[in-house]
């Protein structure tokens, strides 16, 4: 029979004999879940029993106290007494009480571990945290390991900063399982470390430990090793990786890893690696790959051979926007650059020299720099292309000279070893005469150019040369120098650079320079997360709005792609509370960067902000959506942006149109039926005389983005192979968003363009063979959009025929007579029935078409594949349907996972001839390569003459 009151048992606690008290406690423990409210009145007596050192069953008293506190909702006290209960508290018991206490214990341990790790990495060896709390934490992990829940154990150990537990768990796992299972577990650990661990030091320790485990495996997973190298940005580990590959004598895989590093590693890592490998006598072909030259050459070749440029659309924009106005001339220059980006095709400029001649001052600077966008990645011919416009040439305009230096940087962005010295010499030669108008324009272009060329290289000489320009305190050259310094030191977090730039930002009287330094500081702190917090706090607390503006972008870059909650809260607070419109706009834009990986949540988060009374906040919302959802075609983002394209404020419409183009880049009408209407809207804005200039600018640039790179590039912010953010793409978007103040910075978006192709190359000689792959999709699902077609001609206006007055009167009388008689009833009924029938047929046809279209959009898979040529356009949405043909001559050196980029192939029939694709570099190479070896048959019968 169950007890209805605990009074008799509680009375026994006042007895003198310990055995009676023990009996009472054990009995109370059985009913505490039902009668806890009554027992809570005697809680002081139960606690007193626990505090009595002479009492033999103190642990039972602690357990009861814990259960009472648990039911009262006081979890900290409940955990305290549960820990004191020692073995009486059974963590294996299946009850809500035990689950809650264990959960709260782990939470408390994690909080303490987080605090202690920053002070001492070996905190767990020194009993700094309550040993009882540590005991529950460790017992829980043991329980997980016994139940073969290794992933759960690793997750808990990661949260508790216990590298020792992770190491021992992995060691035992690696000894038991196969290599493939072990690689899966380490990949899981890496994903957790990269996406959830907030402490940079601890994350680095995990990655290094994972690298050691992978290197000691019998069959190395080089893709995972490469992922660790890129995330740590450590050239030393990269050297170890290539050393192991050399020992295994796998040239094909070495080449593939080198190509992967070129697409994802920093310029600093690549330069150190090339220097070290050269000193150690590595294969020149491998060193050539690491220089970036082959990758850029392949991409230029793909973009040139497959260009699908809508010249008609560009010409329509040019003719609709008067080139006399620098705003419109700049818009067309930027759009032209984007549409031809990387194709090395400057035919539009050559065909429109009179239009080009209309450019004045900075519009001339932007137009010249657009050549750099067109020839992006043309590392071999870049300087030759820009030679007619560079200082020392016959070019008379200072804006052309400055623009050419900026363009040179755009060509060599991230691969600037061959041009850095040239640009540095120009800066050094001219920095002494800074302040002169001609020299300032030159230094402006050179500073931006060298920032691009030396991006992420941490080159001290470049930094010092730019600092010299900055300290001359000229608004024009100083702003560009500040941005160049940030680009050069990208992601390094160098304390001296941060100190120099922050101090000078408070001293200078030029707003342009302060803003340049603020954005430069953000660039230096790229990817540094909590290590940038002190600087962020200082910047956001500043009275100078331009520094607060930079503070928002510092959060954006320091926490890019992390989805960090505290960063999001901070930005939302600034977005709704700051007194300055520019700062509020920057804070909303920054949300897009922080939530890059969680892009599906962005429309929901910014939806209310898109309806803000403040136009700058609405503008920031548009950019945030464009950045976070770039290249994704996300419908919920389009739904938020659509009303903003009709906003009453011109710059909000501008931002909305640009954001839509970034989201819908490489989308066709078949992938998204809204694309056609959006393109029509862009064109109608450009051609409408009543639209404001800023809206027209936005529509023109948006057209350029939608058709970028000859319709063969997308904006890809994450590297699928390594799981890291694409640094160039992120930097390109940050700098592009600064075009609000300075239109020439719009060219930076070209850094974010990634060619949409799979380029299969032969590992033995890096040649591109002609072969085909399978695509298991409907053949026309991913075809190019239709080209713009202007209406064939206007209808000829009909001229009224002269009519005599007598004829007119006769016609009027006849009409009146007919009206009086009225139509035949049967005729009326017949006519009505025919109209109804026609309407029903139309409705049915429209419905069927719509259903067919929807079915097509949803299901693109086809069981019967069609063939796709090597080095042709393969959209990101299409790549999942691509596979190499089974038992084909060319097979990838590692498993193909549907990612775009360079794929190294193993040739199964190396002695057989094969047709090759000629690259841009080979087309212009006067020293033709040796022909493929061939046999001459001695017994050849030549026909007689």
UniProtKB/Swiss-Prot annotation:
N-acetylated by NAT1. The modification Phosphothreonine is found at residues 801, 932. Keywords: Acetylation, Phosphoprotein, Proteasome, Repeat. InterPro entries: 26S_Psome_Rpn2 (IPR016642), ARM-like (IPR011989), ARM-type_fold (IPR016024), Proteasome/cyclosome_rpt (IPR002015), PSMD1_RPN2_N (IPR048570), RPN2_C (IPR040623). GO terms for cellular component: nucleus; proteasome complex; proteasome regulatory particle, base subcomplex; proteasome storage granule. One of its GO terms (biological process) is proteasome assembly. Disulfide bonds: none annotated. Present with 4750 molecules/cell in log phase SD medium. Acts as a regulatory subunit of the 26S proteasome which is involved in the ATP-dependent degradation of ubiquitinated proteins. This is 26S proteasome regulatory subunit RPN2. The gene is RPN2.
């Amino acid at each position: 029979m169950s007890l209805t009151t605990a009074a008799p048992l509680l009375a026994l606690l006042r007895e003198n004999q310990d055995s009676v008290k023990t009996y009472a406690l054990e009995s109370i423990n059985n009913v505490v879940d039902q009668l806890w409210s009554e027992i809570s009145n005697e809680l002081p007596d139960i606690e007193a029993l626990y505090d009595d050192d002479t009492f033999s069953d103190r642990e039972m008293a602690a357990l009861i106290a814990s259960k009472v506190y648990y039911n009262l909702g006081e979890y900290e006290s409940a955990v305290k007494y549960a820990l004191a209960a020692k073995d009486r508290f059974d963590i294996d018991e299946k009850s809500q009480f035990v689950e809650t206490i264990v959960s709260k214990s782990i939470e408390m341990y994690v909080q303490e571990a987080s605090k202690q790790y920053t002070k001492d990495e070996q905190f767990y060896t020194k009993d700094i945290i309550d040993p009882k709390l540590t005991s529950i934490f460790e017992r829980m992990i043991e329980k997980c390991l016994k139940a073969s829940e290794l992933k759960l154990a690793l997750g808990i150990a990661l949260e508790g900063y216990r590298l020792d537990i992770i190491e021992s768990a992995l060691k035992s796992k690696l000894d038991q399982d196969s290599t493939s299972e072990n690689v899966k577990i380490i990949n899981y650990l890496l994903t957790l470390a990269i996406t959830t661990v907030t402490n940079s030091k601890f994350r680095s320790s995990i990655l290094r430990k994972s690298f050691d485990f992978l290197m000691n495996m019998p069959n190395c997973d080089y893709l995972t090793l490469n992922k660790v190298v890129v995330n740590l940005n450590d050239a030393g580990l990269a050297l170890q990786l290539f050393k192991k590959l050399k020992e295994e004598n796998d040239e094909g895989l070495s080449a593939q890893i080198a190509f992967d590093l070129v697409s994802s590693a920093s310029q600093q890592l690549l330069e150190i690696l090339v220097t070290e490998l050269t000193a150690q006598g590595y294969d020149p072909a491998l060193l050539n790959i690491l220089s970036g030259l082959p990758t850029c050459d392949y991409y230029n070749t793909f973009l040139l051979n497959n260009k699908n440029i809508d010249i008609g659309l560009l010409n329509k924009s040019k003719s609709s926007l008067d080139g006399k106005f620098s705003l419109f001339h700049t818009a067309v220059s930027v759009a032209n650059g984007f549409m031809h980006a990387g194709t090395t095709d400057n035919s539009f400029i050559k065909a429109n020299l009179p239009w080009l001649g209309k450019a004045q001052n900075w519009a001339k600077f932007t137009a010249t720099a657009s050549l750099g966008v067109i020839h992006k990645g043309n590392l071999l011919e870049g300087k030759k292309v820009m030679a007619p416009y560079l200082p020392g040439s016959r070019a008379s305009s200072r804006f052309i000279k400055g623009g050419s230096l900026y363009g040179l940087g755009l060509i060599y962005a991230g691969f600037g070893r061959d041009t850095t010295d040239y640009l540095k010499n120009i800066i050094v030669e001219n920095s002494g005469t800074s302040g002169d108008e001609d020299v300032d324009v030159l230094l402006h272009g050179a500073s931006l150019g060298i920032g691009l060329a030396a991006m992420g290289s941490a080159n001290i000489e470049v930094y010092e040369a730019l600092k010299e320009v900055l300290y001359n305190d000229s608004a024009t050259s100083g702003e560009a120098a500040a941005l160049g310094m940030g680009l050069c030191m990208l992601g390094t977090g160098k304390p001296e650079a941060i100190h120099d730039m922050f101090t000078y930002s408070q001293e200078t009287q030029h707003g342009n320079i302060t803003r340049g330094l603020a954005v430069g500081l953000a660039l230096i702190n790229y990817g540094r997360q909590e290590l940038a917090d002190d600087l962020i706090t200082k910047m956001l607390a500043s009275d100078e709005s331009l520094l607060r503006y930079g503070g928002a972008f510092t959060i954006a870059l320091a926490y890019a792609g992390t989805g960090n909650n505290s960063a999001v809260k901070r930005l939302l607070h600034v977005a709704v509370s700051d007194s300055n419109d520019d700062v509020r706009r920057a804070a909303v834009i920054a949300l897009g960067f922080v939530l890059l990986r969680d892009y599906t949540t962005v429309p929901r988060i910014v939806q209310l902000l898109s309806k803000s009374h403040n136009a700058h906040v609405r503008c920031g919302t548009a950019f945030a959506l464009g950045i976070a959802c770039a290249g994704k075609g996300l419908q919920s983002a389009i739904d938020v942006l659509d009303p903003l394209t009709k906003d009453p404020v011109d710059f909000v419409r501008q931002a909305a149109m640009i954001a839509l183009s970034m989201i819908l880049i490489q989308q066709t009408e078949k992938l998204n039926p809204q694309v056609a209407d959006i393109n029509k809207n862009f064109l109608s804005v450009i051609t409408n005389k009543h639209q404001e200039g800023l809206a027209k600018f936005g529509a023109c640039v948006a057209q350029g983005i939608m058709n970028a790179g000859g319709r063969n590039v997308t904006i890809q912010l994450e590297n699928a192979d390594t799981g890291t953010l694409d640094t160039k793409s992120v930097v390109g978007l940050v700098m592009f968003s600064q075009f609000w103040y300075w239109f020439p910075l719009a060219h930076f978006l070209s850094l974010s363009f990634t060619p949409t192709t799979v380029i299969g190359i032969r590992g033995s000689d890096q040649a591109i063979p002609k072969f085909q792959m399978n695509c298991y999709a409907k053949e026309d699902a991913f075809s190019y959009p239709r080209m713009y077609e202007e209406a064939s001609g206007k209808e000829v206006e009909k001229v009224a025929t002269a009519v005599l007055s007598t004829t007119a009167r006769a016609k009027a009388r006849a009409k009146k007579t007919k009206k009086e008689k009225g139509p035949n009833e049967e005729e009326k009924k017949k006519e009505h029935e025919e109209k109804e029938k026609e309407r029903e047929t139309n409705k049915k046809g429209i419905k069927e078409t719509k259903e067919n279209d929807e079915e097509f959009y949803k299901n693109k898979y086809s069981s019967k594949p069609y063939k796709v040529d090597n080095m042709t356009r393969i959209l990101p949405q299409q790549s999942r349907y691509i596979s190499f043909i089974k038992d084909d001559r060319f097979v990838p050196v590692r498993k193909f996972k549907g990612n775009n980029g360079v794929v190294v192939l193993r040739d199964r029939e190396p002695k057989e001839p094969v047709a090759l694709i000629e690259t841009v570099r080979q087309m212009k190479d006067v020293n033709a390569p040796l022909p493929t070896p061939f046999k001459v048959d001695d017994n050849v019968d030549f026909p007689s003459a």
